[in-house]
Amino acid sequence: MTTTPLIDPFQRAIDYLRVSVTDRCDFRCVYCMSENMTFLPKKELLTLEELDRMCSTFIRLGVKKLRITGGEPLVRRDIMTFFDRMSRHLDSGALRELTLTTNGSQLEKFADGLYAAGMRRINVSMDTLDEKKFAEITRWGRLPQVLRGIDAAQKAGLRIKINAVALKGFNEDELFPMVDWCAERDMDLTFIEVMPMGDIGNENRLGQYWALSDLRNTLRERFTLTELDERTGGPARYVRLEETGQKLGFITPLTHNFCESCNRVRLTCTGELFMCLGQEDNADLRKPLREYPDDDRALENAIRAAIALKPKGHDFDYSRQRLDGQMTRHMSHTGG
C-alpha cells in the first residue's frame, strides 16, 4: 500500500526524525543543564515498545533517517533492544539511516552492538581536548573515558563526526588543535553556536556566545576555506580546508536562518512532537499512541496534523545583547 509522504505547508518533505529517548544524562554540561537538574518521572517517558511503535509509524509515513538523541541515549536502560528492533527497518529498506548523537561516555561498552544494529555513523559531542577543561565544562565527565569510547567506535567500524560547541573564552585557543586532532583520526568536525534553551543555573549564555563568523576568520589565518554546496536539509553549512582536504561544518542557528530546507521534526522522550527546535508549538502524540494501542490510524492522523503546523522558521535571536529567543525547555528533553 502506498502511503502519502509527510509534506509541510511550505512543500518541504519531512523525512528525518530526531528522537530523544531520555532526558537523563551522565554529564551536566554548563551550556545544557543545571548541575542540580530535576529529571522527568520515568512513568512519563515512552516505553521502548512505545518508541518502537512511534518510530515505525513515522517510517511508514516516509521518514528515511532516524537519529536517536537524549539526554544521553546510551544511559537509557535496555536501549540496545530498541536499536536492534529498529534494524529491521534498515533490513527492509524502509529506513535509509539509523544514527546516534552521544557524549561518548558509554561508547566503549556499546560500540560493537551499535554497529551490529546497522549504525554506520555517529556524532560525538566533545568541546575540548583538555582533560581539566573537559571536567569543567561537563562537570561530571571524564575525557579519557570518552577517548576510549571513540577509539572503540572507530575500531567497530563506525564513522565519527565530532560536534564542538564554540564557547567564548573557553575553547577559542583549541580551534587549530581540534581541527588537527580530527584530521589525524579521519573524523569530520562541526562547530556549533551555543543555543538559547532552558535554565542552566548560574551560567550566562550570552557570555558564552562565540559567533562562528569570528571562528571562520580565525581559521582563514591558516587555511584556505572553500564553500561546499552541500545540503542535507539540516542546519550545517560546510567548507573544505584546501590544505588538508578536511570537511568542516558550521551550525549557526543564531546568526544564520537555516530553515529554508528543513526536513526534520523532533520527538521528545514523553511523546511530544516539536515541529521546530526554535519554537514552542508541539503536538501530543503520546495520547493517541496510548488511547489506541491496537490501531495506528489515530497516531498517523495526529502526525499529519502536526506536520501541517510546521512553521517556516525559528525564533532564535541574540541581537542587541538580549536573549529574546530563549526557549524554556531543555535540549536534554527535546533532543540535541
Swiss-Prot record:
Per UniProt, GTP binds at: R18, R67, T101, K161, R264, V265, R266
From which organism does this entry originate?
A: Dinoroseobacter shibae (strain DSM 16493 / NCIMB 14021 / DFL 12)
What CDD domains does the entry give?
Radical_SAM, Twitch_MoaA
Domain spans labelled Radical SAM core = 9-235
Residues bound to [4Fe-4S] cluster 1 are C25, C29, C32
Question: Origin, by domain of life?
Answer: Bacteria
Task: Describe which pathway this protein belongs to, using the record's wording.
Answer: Cofactor biosynthesis; molybdopterin biosynthesis
Q: Which PANTHER family match?
A: MOLYBDENUM COFACTOR BIOSYNTHESIS PROTEIN 1, MOLYBDOPTERIN COFACTOR SYNTHESIS PROTEIN A
Q: How is the cofactor bound?
A: Binds 2 [4Fe-4S] clusters. Binds 1 [4Fe-4S] cluster coordinated with 3 cysteines and an exchangeable S-adenosyl-L-methionine and 1 [4Fe-4S] cluster coordinated with 3 cysteines and the GTP-derived substrate.
> What EC number(s) does the entry state?
4.1.99.22
Give the protein name, as stated in the record.
GTP 3',8-cyclase
Q: Which residues bind [4Fe-4S] cluster 2?
A: C259, C262, C276
* Keyword tags: 4Fe-4S, GTP-binding, Iron, Iron-sulfur, Lyase, Metal-binding, Molybdenum cofactor biosynthesis, Nucleotide-binding, S-adenosyl-L-methionine
Reaction it catalyzes = GTP + AH2 + S-adenosyl-L-methionine = (8S)-3',8-cyclo-7,8-dihydroguanosine 5'-triphosphate + 5'-deoxyadenosine + L-methionine + A + H(+)
GO terms, biological process: Mo-molybdopterin cofactor biosynthetic process
GO MF term (any one): 4 iron, 4 sulfur cluster binding
